[in-house]
């Protein structure tokens, strides 16, 4: 019997017992760092001579793992294994595949502290963010297991005299999962196991910055008894195997979360039919955002400031849904800005091993990019708070507020993916929405207002996939807030939704005459 779905709880770190328990998990994980991570192809580990290092972004002298690098030949072997495994995996009943996922979720639940501790070191996640990431991974897995059972019998269609008709779902084949580093467990696990529970097989190419977190899932899948070849683990250099994975004649689908540049490249390459290819490839992509919180007049300015600060600086602004733009009515602009600055001054930044509010950004490339945007923004507007950067021991960037910007300014148009928020003023609600929509992206947004008519207008006109009232624009919850965006934010294939598994299924009709 499968119990009703509910969200996995976080860990209450106001309880000293939980703090001590998590410190023990951190100590244990720290003692196991600098381990060697293999490829996993057809259930067999393969260690390669050519490797790269995953490092702690909060302490760049600390090596997290030595990671084997897959070659194109390894990818070929992985496709061969996945194609062979597909022959039997697709014949598992919907119920058996769903029950397998529930077993996986149970193991993750038991190892939640360990997985969270890995993310503290490998992704620089604060404790709450790391635990939330692991918990969300459990949520995705539990939710998709139940979704598969609901789809097991297909959907009803009409019969007529002498004719019985069935409409049902079947898996589509082998695909590729390319997850991001910012939610290295939740998104990775969800985008890998959604196609798997639907009966497909997968090549998982983990994010280069967080391979150990992804390898933990491989350990768990083996412990749960996943048949060989259903999920194959192929870390490697995207320049060598990225296009190769997408272009392969064996690739039926690609699930991708990451940058716009890479996402659009995947779309372009997947559209080309290769020699011998007998199907059209599907691309399920989430490509970021330039998310905004719109603040109306006559509102609770404390709520507005708190929503902006938490959405802009949680996990150092490295969320696809992070608030990068604060679009504020002129009547409350100065007050909201002042309160946001005051709140930001109290945020702690440092090594997240010590449970700071903010940790590092993920790598040198991102650090340099964010630093450059701060310099640009300081010229375009007025630096009100933060702006400091330090990469002496880790990739640390102060939470930064830049005011007096125009919607057309560079830092108001381009995705920064760091702890930087720009403030812009609007004369009325209509202009606030115009500014909010003045972007290529359409992922998340929030509106702080007490005016019901303005909220109704925002629901109709604010062009984002996830819109929130009187709260921040981050923290979508699986099963409650299916997540995905419009425009250049991706394909709006809402993760954690009743429809998500349909991306990995074909619809078949069988008509019997009597």
Swiss-Prot record:
Task: Tell me which EC number(s) this protein carries.
Answer: 1.2.1.88
Which lineage is the organism of this entry classified under, starting from the top rank?
A: Bacteria, Bacillati, Bacillota, Bacilli, Bacillales
The residues responsible for catalysis, as annotated, are 286, 320
An example GO CC term for this entry is:
cytoplasmic side of plasma membrane
Known catalytic reactions: L-glutamate 5-semialdehyde + NAD(+) + H2O = L-glutamate + NADH + 2 H(+)
Record has DNA damage as a keyword: no
Note the NCBIfam families from the entry: D1pyr5carbox2 (TIGR01237), PRK03137.1 (NF002852)
Catalytic EC class: oxidoreductase
Q: Which UniProt keywords apply?
A: NAD, Oxidoreductase
Its recorded name reads 1-pyrroline-5-carboxylate dehydrogenase
Record Pfam families: Aldedh (PF00171)
The entry lists its GO molecular-function terms as: 1-pyrroline-5-carboxylate dehydrogenase activity
What GO terms in the biological process aspect are recorded for it? glutamate biosynthetic process; proline catabolic process to glutamate
| Domain of life assignment | Bacteria
InterPro entries (alphabetical): Ald_DH/histidinol_DH (IPR016161), Ald_DH_C (IPR016163), Ald_DH_CS_CYS (IPR016160), Ald_DH_CS_GLU (IPR029510), Ald_DH_N (IPR016162), Aldehyde_DH_dom (IPR015590), Proline_metab_enzyme (IPR050485), RocA (IPR005932)
> To which protein family does this belong?
Belongs to the aldehyde dehydrogenase family. RocA subfamily.
**Source organism per UniProt:** Staphylococcus saprophyticus subsp. saprophyticus (strain ATCC 15305 / DSM 20229 / NCIMB 8711 / NCTC 7292 / S-41)
Give the record's pathway.
Answer: Amino-acid degradation; L-proline degradation into L-glutamate; L-glutamate from L-proline: step 2/2
């Amino acid at each position: 019997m499968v119990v009703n779905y509910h969200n996995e709880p976080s860990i209450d770190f106001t309880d000293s017992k939980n703090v001590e328990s998590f410190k023990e998990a951190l100590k244990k994980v720290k003692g196991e760092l600098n381990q060697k991570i293999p490829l996993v192809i057809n259930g067999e580990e393969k260690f390669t001579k050519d490797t790269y290092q995953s490092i702690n972004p909060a302490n760049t002298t600390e090596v997290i793992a030595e990671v084997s690098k897959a070659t194109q030949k390894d990818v070929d072997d992985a496709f061969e294994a996945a194609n062979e495994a597909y022959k039997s995996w697709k014949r598992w009943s919907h119920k058996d595949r769903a029950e397998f996922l529930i077993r996986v979720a149970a193991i993750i639940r038991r190892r939640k502290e360990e997985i969270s501790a890995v993310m503290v070191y490998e992704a620089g996640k604060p404790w709450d963010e790391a635990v939330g990431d692991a918990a969300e991974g459990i949520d995705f897995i539990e939710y998709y297991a139940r979704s598969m059972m609901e789809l097991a019998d297909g959907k009803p269609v009409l019969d007529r005299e002498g004719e019985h008709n069935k409409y049902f779902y079947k898996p589509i084949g082998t695909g590729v999962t390319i997850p991001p580093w910012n939610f290295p467990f939740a998104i990775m696990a969800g985008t890998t196991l959604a196609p798997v529970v639907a009966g497909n097989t997968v090549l998982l190419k983990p994010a280069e910055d967080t391979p150990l977190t992804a390898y933990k899932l491989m350990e768990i899948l083996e412990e749960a008894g996943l048949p060989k070849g259903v999920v194959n683990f192929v870390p490697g250099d995207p320049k060598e195997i990225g296009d190769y994975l997408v272009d392969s004649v064996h690739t039926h689908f690609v699930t991708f979360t990451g940058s716009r540049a890479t996402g659009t490249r995947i779309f372009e390459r997947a559209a080309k039919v290769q020699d011998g290819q007998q199907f059209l490839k599907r691309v399920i992509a989430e490509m970021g955002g330039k998310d905004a919180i719109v603040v109306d007049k006559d509102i609770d300015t404390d709520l507005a400031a708190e929503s902006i600060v938490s959405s802009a600086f949680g996990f150092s602004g490295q969320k696809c849904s992070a608030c990068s733009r604060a679009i504020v009515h002129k009547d409350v602009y100065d007050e909201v800005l002042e309160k946001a600055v005051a709140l930001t001054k109290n945020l702690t930044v440092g090594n997240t091993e010590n449970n700071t509010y903010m940790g590092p950004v993920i790598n040198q490339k991102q650090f340099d990019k964010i630093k450059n945007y701060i310099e640009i923004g300081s010229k375009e507007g007025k630096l009100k708070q933060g702006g400091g950067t330090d990469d002496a021991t880790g990739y640390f960037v102060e939470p930064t507020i830049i005011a007096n910007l125009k919607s057309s300014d560079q830092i108001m148009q381009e995705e920064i993916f760091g702890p930087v928020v720009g403030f812009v003023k609007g004369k009325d609600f209509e202009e606030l929405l115009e500014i909010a929509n003045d972007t290529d992206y359409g992922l998340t947004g929030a509106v702080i207002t007490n005016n019901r008519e303005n909220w109704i207008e925002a629901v109709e006109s604010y062009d984002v996939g996830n819109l929130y009232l009187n709260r921040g624009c981050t923290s979508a919850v699986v099963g409650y807030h299916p997540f995905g965006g419009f425009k250049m934010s991706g394909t709006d294939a809402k993760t954690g939704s009743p429809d998500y598994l349909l991306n990995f299924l074909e619809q078949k009709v069988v008509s019997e005459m009597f």
